[in-house]
Amino acid sequence: MPIFKKPAIKAEAGKKKEIPRGLFQKCPGCGQVVPDIELTQNQRVCPRCDYHQAQPASERIQSLLDPDTFVEMDADLKSVDVLRFQGMASYTDRLKKYHESTGLLDAVITGHGILDGYKVAIAVMDFGFLAATMGSVVGEKITRTIEYGTTNRCAVIIVAASGGARMYEGMLSLMQMAKTSGALACHAEEKLPYISVLTNPTTAGVMASFASLGDVIIAEPRSMIGFAGPRVIRETTHQDLPERFQTAEFLQEHGLVDMIVHRKKLRDEISRLLSYFTVML
């Protein structure tokens, strides 16, 4: 036996250290771990690879509008489980869960404010709430925002990010596609501008309705934009898909997106567009 024996270092029970949640985030673009405060200060754009991460609706509004000019509308509207949907978890339980995690009653914040001196009606979807799927409340709030813009003769800006129609509401969800599109048709008849901003991801029923109807359609870099997912299309058509299929860059090359704008330049670009539309307002 050895004369001197080095005692093993034992970890004290129950003292395992963990990194507090919310302090760091792993970038989906480059895989690097980035401090959350650094992402917030950089408008949720990765400082390492420039990947545009999902941005909470409240932060987006703050970055776009002039300070202290935003007035929220219909903040008290919230979804109800009309169909009594049951799955792995009930629709009611899911709504409660996402309300607790985001502080939102549903997946969009709407209102009006001033952008570089121009009055605008604005709706910003928040992917953190049930993948920003469009149910009856989301569709109603967006429709009311469009109607506010029409009544007050101001531009409408909608920042979209969505997984599509909300299956928990069935046909009530699908009819929002027609309702929002109809409101935009009335807005267009008054010769008033609508600027659509597509972020990552914008898909399915949202892309097939109001998100693709802008007078000017802007997309953020590398955003996934489309209707059905690549796997579904591949299995349905039995064909290989083009490289970069359903990316903002691919859609711009094929004329479905007017411009790709970095998030930090988005406010200035929208302001420039509004200056062209001034004669209409």
Show the residue positions of the predicted features.
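Short cysteine-rich clusters marking metal-coordination/redox-active sites
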Residues: 27-30, 46-49
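Cys/His-rich microdomains that often coordinate metals
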Residues: 33-34, 52-53
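Long, charge-rich boundary regions
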Residues: 55-132
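Conserved catalytic cores of soluble enzyme domains
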Residues: 162-281
